[in-house]
């Protein structure tokens, strides 16, 4: 507390000083005397203080700030520092608290600055209400209107200032300070631009089973109930011919990049809020119907020899998101619901080509007309559902024969939020299908039993998609 004793003395004397008017005739030993009676008395007053304090006044000031002394002590210190003649202490010049030894040297004024400075002072005195920015604009306009003769005195003054500046600061070098704020603003704008560029694709990541690019290379298509299983894009089976590549190029162009499967189940998106205009207008003719004739060019002329094709009623309104498909992908086996394990609530996939393990097995769908799967969960309204034929290719020869495999999709609604559509639908909506071995019927498998479906006319040339089948269902 030795350091604090002089401070306490100073504060007491300072209180006395503040109580009465400070005058130069105050006692000489009052260390905190704020008297402006000349440098000699000031130095005499303050030099005993230097002897008393083992540390310099500057360090004392730091200590007072660091240790948060009371207000009276701070005031006393400020009085001492104010009264001290700082020319006696050698110290580096500090500009804005920076540790540079050299003070900031301004550039010499050019001719316009000489003009603007003089004119601004004059105008500011005459018209104090003028705003400074408006004044600067007006001075700039006036400067451009001046002729060479009128500018000459300012040019000469600027030249004189430049020569004087060079004498005063012979080693002066102009070093402009970089403005970080502007670059930060630009980078923020760039970041926001990137975010706005990415955000539409976030929709397509959830919708990626809808757009026909997901059937590119006629490979596996992952319906939304199956997003959790795949961590990469749809793989191309080895049987894919090169004529089938990229049936969904219109939508790929719109998206700008192929969408990756997320490794986990994304949150359920209410696709009723998604603008269908973002999907391909070349692909979707209307919400209610879907025309598959335009994809004839992408299909091979005779299909795949030795590969089974099946025709299945498919939920129409090929709009926004996909239904659990009645067609399974790339050598996967059909199982009736009696064969399923009840806790899975989805068809397990037997994939002989890729054998990819899934976190939770879901329906593997293969969509060979590059049409959009429709989301039956949107069909709570009693509108009529359209059905189009689907041509299943790339089935391996291990395709089992299961007759009358019934699929009751009301059983699946507990496993995934995508199956909540099935609550309003009858279990007879997915009727009994007969799937035959490819060796028996290599080209085309008709629907054998149409008990749940009113009428499904069979197409005569399914490999060319000339007659898309539309079957209309009404809600029970």
UniProtKB/Swiss-Prot annotation:
One of its GO terms (molecular function) is DNA-binding transcription factor activity, RNA polymerase II-specific. Residues 56-67, 157-174 have a biased composition (Basic and acidic residues). Keywords: Activator, Chondrogenesis, Cytoplasm, Developmental protein, Differentiation, DNA-binding, Gonadal differentiation, Isopeptide bond, Nucleus, Transcription, Transcription regulation, Ubl conjugation. SMART domains: HMG (SM00398). GO terms for biological process: cartilage development; chondrocyte differentiation; gonadal mesoderm development; heart development; morphogenesis of an epithelium; negative regulation of transcription by RNA polymerase II; neural crest formation; oligodendrocyte differentiation. The keyword Transcription regulation applies. Sumoylated. Lys-364 is the major site of sumoylation, although sumoylation at Lys-61 also occurs. Sumoylation plays a key role in regulating formation of the neural crest and otic placode. A motif (9aaTAD 2) lies at residues 291-299. Its main location: nucleus. InterPro entries: HMG_box_dom, HMG_box_dom_sf, Sox_N, SOX_TF. A motif (9aaTAD 3) lies at residues 427-435. SUPFAM superfamilies: HMG-box. There is a cross-link at residues 61, 364 (Glycyl lysine isopeptide (Lys-Gly) (interchain with G-Cter in SUMO)). Residues 42-52, 211-220, 345-360, 452-476 have a biased composition (Polar residues). CDD domains: HMG-box_SoxE. GO terms for cellular component: cytoplasm; nucleus. A motif (9aaTAD 1) lies at residues 276-285. Interacts with the sumoylation factors ube2i/ubc9 and sumo1. Transcription factor that plays a key role in chondrocytes differentiation and skeletal development. Specifically binds the 5'-ACAAAG-3' DNA motif present in enhancers and super-enhancers and promotes expression of genes important for chondrogenesis, including COL2A1. Plays a central role in successive steps of chondrocyte differentiation. Absolutely required for precartilaginous condensation, the first step in chondrogenesis during which skeletal progenitors differentiate into prechondrocytes. This is Transcription factor Sox-9-B. It comes from Xenopus laevis (African clawed frog).
């Amino acid at each position: 507390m030795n350091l604090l004793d002089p401070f306490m003395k100073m504060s007491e004397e300072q209180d006395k000083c503040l109580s009465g008017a400070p005058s130069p005739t105050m006692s000489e030993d009052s260390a905190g005397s704020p008297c402006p009676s000349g440098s000699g008395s000031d130095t005499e007053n303050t030099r005993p203080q230097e002897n008393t304090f083992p540390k310099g006044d500057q360090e004392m000031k730091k200590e007072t700030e660091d240790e948060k002394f009371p207000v009276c002590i701070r005031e006393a210190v400020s009085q001492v520092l104010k009264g001290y003649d700082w020319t006696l202490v050698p110290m580096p010049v500090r500009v804005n608290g920076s540790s540079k030894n050299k003070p900031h040297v301004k550039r010499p004024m050019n001719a316009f600055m000489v003009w603007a400075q003089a004119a601004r002072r004059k105008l500011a005195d005459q018209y104090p209400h003028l705003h400074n920015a408006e004044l600067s604009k007006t001075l700039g306009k006036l400067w451009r209107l001046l002729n060479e003769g009128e500018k000459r005195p300012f040019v000469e003054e600027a030249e004189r200032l430049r020569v004087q500046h060079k004498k005063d600061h012979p080693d002066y070098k102009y070093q402009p300070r970089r403005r970080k704020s502007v670059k930060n603003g630009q980078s923020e704008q760039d970041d926001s631009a990137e975010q706005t560029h990415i955000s539409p694709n976030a929709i397509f990541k959830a919708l990626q089973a809808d757009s026909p690019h997901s059937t590119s290379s006629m490979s596996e298509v992952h319906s939304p109930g199956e997003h959790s299983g795949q961590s990469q894009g749809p793989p191309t089976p080895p049987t894919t011919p090169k004529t089938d590549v990229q049936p969904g190029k219109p939508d790929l162009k719109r998206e700008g990049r192929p969408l990756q499967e997320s490794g986990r189940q994304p949150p359920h998106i209410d696709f009723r809020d998604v603008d269908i205009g973002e999907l391909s207008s070349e692909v979707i003719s209307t919400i209610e119907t879907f025309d598959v004739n335009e994809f004839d060019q992408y299909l091979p002329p005779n299909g795949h020899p030795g590969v089974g094709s099946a025709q299945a009623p498919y939920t129409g309104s090929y709009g926004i998101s996909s239904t659990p498909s009645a067609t399974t992908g790339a050598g996967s086996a059909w199982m009736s619901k009696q064969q399923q394990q009840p806790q899975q609530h989805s068809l397990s996939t037997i994939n002989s080509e890729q054998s990819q393990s899934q976190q939770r097995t879901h329906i593997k769908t293969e969509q060979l007309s590059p049409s959009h799967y429709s989301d039956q969960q949107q069909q709570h309204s009693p509108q009529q559902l359209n059905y189009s034929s689907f041509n299943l290719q790339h089935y391996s020869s291990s395709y089992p024969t299961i007759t009358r495999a019934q699929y009751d999709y009301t059983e699946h609604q507990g496993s995934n939020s995508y199956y909540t559509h099935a609550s309003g639908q009858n279990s007879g909506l997915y009727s009994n299908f007969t799937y035959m071995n490819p060796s028996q019927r290599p080209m085309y498998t008709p629907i054998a039993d149409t008990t749940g479906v009113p009428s499904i006319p069979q197409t005569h040339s399914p490999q060319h998609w000339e007659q898309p089948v539309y079957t209309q269902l009404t809600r029970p």
